[in-house]
């Protein structure tokens, strides 16, 4: 039996996860927009249109060619406030603890200062969690959350089997900072007191894949296997699609699938 987002928010040990779950409940959306565009203006214009329909935006800030903190991040934060969504920088950290600490809080992006959520691979072990947590604590008073990459949506991904299980074990090292997984299904943990959020990429209502190995599953498919947040990218704005029309369509599909799951 699945609990509602609101019920889970009340008892969640993470302030970030609790805030996101409450936002999802009040805004009636479990849609995360993956906005992989290379210009600041396009990023901001898309998010102004998609903002009313999403709980979260997933960025790859290092592909923005005209990036600046003042002209990219500050307006992005303004849109997040205006439309009431949170920010997830899909950085996929994968180095030793000390290095990821420097990467997360420094450089030109200073990700820990503005992204509510980021993510990491488990390949280097549990030190990556501690390094990222230290960076967050040293650079901001705002709560931050980490997703571990347990599974990927691309064809031939190596994140399966024993690797996935060991990533789950790493996630258990910090109940407050690690809020869940990028995964294709429920990762369990409830019997040990964990309430992980599952965010699933590769969700599409129309296409089944692309020429570079991406594989899409439907909203209903992913919700029935334990997903909490559906991550949609090109389905919202690619191939000349209208982001407002598609945003509403995916938001409604995700919410209806969620209601069926908790009924």
Curated annotation (Swiss-Prot):
One Pfam short name: OMPdecase
An example Gene Ontology CC term for this record: cytosol
Protein keywords: Decarboxylase, Lyase, Pyrimidine biosynthesis
GO molecular function per UniProt: orotidine-5'-phosphate decarboxylase activity
Keyword 4Fe-4S: no
EC number: 4.1.1.23
CDD domains listed in its UniProt record: OMP_decarboxylase_like
The reaction(s) this protein catalyses: orotidine 5'-phosphate + H(+) = UMP + CO2
Active-site residues per Swiss-Prot or TrEMBL entry: 92 (proton donor)
Single GO BP term: 'de novo' pyrimidine nucleobase biosynthetic process
Record Gene3D superfamilies: Aldolase class I
Residues given in the record as substrate binding sites: 36, 58-60, 90-99, 216, 234
Pathways per UniProt: Pyrimidine metabolism; UMP biosynthesis via de novo pathway; UMP from orotate: step 2/2
Cross-referenced NCBIfam families: pyrF
Family: Belongs to the OMP decarboxylase family.
Protein's UniProt name: Orotidine 5'-phosphate decarboxylase
Encoding gene (name): URA3
């Amino acid at each position: 039996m699945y609990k509602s987002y609101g019920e889970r928010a009340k008892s969640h040990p993470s302030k970030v996860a609790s805030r996101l779950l409450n936002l999802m409940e009040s805004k009636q959306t479990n849609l995360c927009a993956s906005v992989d565009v290379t210009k600041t203006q396009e990023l901001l214009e898309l998010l102004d249109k998609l903002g009313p329909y999403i709980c979260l935006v997933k960025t790859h800030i290092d592909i923005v060619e005209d990036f600046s903190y003042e002209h990219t991040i500050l307006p992005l934060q303004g849109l997040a406030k205006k439309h009431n969504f949170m920010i997830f920088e899909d950085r996929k950290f994968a180095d030793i603890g000390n290095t990821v600490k420097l990467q997360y809080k420094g450089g030109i992006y200073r990700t820990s200062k503005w992204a509510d959520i980021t993510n990491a691979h488990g390949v280097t072990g549990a030190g990556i969690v501690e390094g990222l947590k230290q960076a967050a604590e040293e650079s901001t008073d705002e709560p931050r959350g980490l997703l571990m990459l347990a599974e990927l949506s691309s064809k031939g991904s190596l994140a399966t089997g024993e690797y996935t299980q060991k990533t789950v074990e790493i996630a258990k090292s910090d109940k407050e900072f690690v809020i869940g997984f990028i995964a294709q299904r429920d990762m369990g943990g409830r019997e040990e007191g964990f309430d992980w959020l599952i965010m699933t990429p590769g969700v599409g209502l129309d296409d089944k894949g692309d020429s570079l190995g991406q594989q899409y599953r439907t909203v209903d498919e992913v919700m029935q296997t334990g997903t909490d947040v559906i991550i949609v990218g090109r389905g919202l704005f690619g191939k000349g699609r209208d982001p407002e029309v598609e945003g509403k369509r995916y938001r409604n599909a995700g919410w209806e699938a969620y209601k069926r799951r908790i009924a």
